[in-house]
């Protein structure tokens, strides 16, 4: 039986233990990748799909032209739209509802909209206490659009070369 000097040296000097200890110490002193979530927020992609919003033109007029493409393309059938004609011949929505309990956040509504009226904004913190609060009507969607307009416009501008 031959004596294995390399194996004995490795065993005697506890080389594996030293390598493991060194690796542990390297991670112990390195900066932590974890965010303290409620107090720190990480970056979001411009393509992030969060809470829905209806946008307005800079003059205050609603962008939605009641084409109902978003309603037709929604695979979850979460969008309901009623529309009427105006005196000038254009159409506008009288009712625009989204059932957020059905929504799967696929983004098809945003992609189908020819005037960028319906968008999925950057807000992902909209937990509710009751189910009824997840039924968004036109006023709630317009309020979301007004609240997040600056960030929505920036995200759409950043994503424009890829659309």
Swiss-Prot record:
Localization per record: Cell inner membrane
Molecular function, one GO term: 4 iron, 4 sulfur cluster binding
Family, similarity comment: Belongs to the complex I 23 kDa subunit family.
GO CC term (a single one): plasma membrane
Bound cofactor: record note: Binds 2 [4Fe-4S] clusters per subunit.
Cofactor needs: [4Fe-4S] cluster
Stated name of the protein: NADH-quinone oxidoreductase subunit 9
Reactions performed catalytically: a quinone + NADH + 5 H(+)(in) = a quinol + NAD(+) + 4 H(+)(out)
Keyword line: 4Fe-4S, Cell inner membrane, Cell membrane, Iron, Iron-sulfur, Membrane, Metal-binding, NAD, Quinone, Repeat, Translocase, Ubiquinone
EC number, UniProt record: 7.1.1.-
Binding-site residues, [4Fe-4S] cluster 2: 74, 103, 106, 109
Membrane topology: Peripheral membrane protein
Summary of the function given for this chain in its UniProt record: NDH-1 shuttles electrons from NADH, via FMN and iron-sulfur (Fe-S) centers, to quinones in the respiratory chain. The immediate electron acceptor for the enzyme in this species is believed to be ubiquinone. Couples the redox reaction to proton translocation (for every two electrons transferred, four hydrogen ions are translocated across the cytoplasmic membrane), and thus conserves the redox energy in a proton gradient.
UniProt KW Membrane keyword: yes
InterPro entries named among the record's database cross-references: 4Fe4S_Fe-S-bd, 4Fe4S_Fe_S_CS, NADH_quinone_OxRdtase_chainI
A Pfam family that the UniProt record links to this protein: Fer4_7
């Amino acid at each position: 039986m031959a004596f294995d000097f390399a194996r004995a040296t490795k065993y005697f000097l506890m080389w594996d233990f030293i390598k493991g200890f060194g690796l542990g110490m390297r991670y112990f002193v390195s900066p932590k990748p974890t965010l303290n979530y409620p107090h720190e927020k990480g970056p979001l992609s411009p393509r992030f799909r969060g809470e829905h919003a209806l946008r307005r033109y800079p003059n205050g007029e609603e962008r939605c032209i009641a084409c109902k493409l978003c309603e037709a393309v929604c695979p979850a059938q979460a969008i309901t739209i009623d529309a009427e004609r105006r005196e000038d011949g254009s159409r506008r929505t009288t009712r625009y509802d989204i059932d957020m309990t059905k929504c799967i956040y696929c983004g098809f509504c945003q992609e189908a909209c020819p005037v960028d009226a319906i968008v999925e904004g950057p807000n992902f913190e909209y937990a509710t206490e009751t189910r009824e609060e997840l039924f968004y009507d036109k006023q709630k969607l317009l309020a979301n659009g007004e609240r997040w307009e600056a960030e929505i416009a920036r995200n759409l501008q950043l994503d424009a070369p890829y659309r």
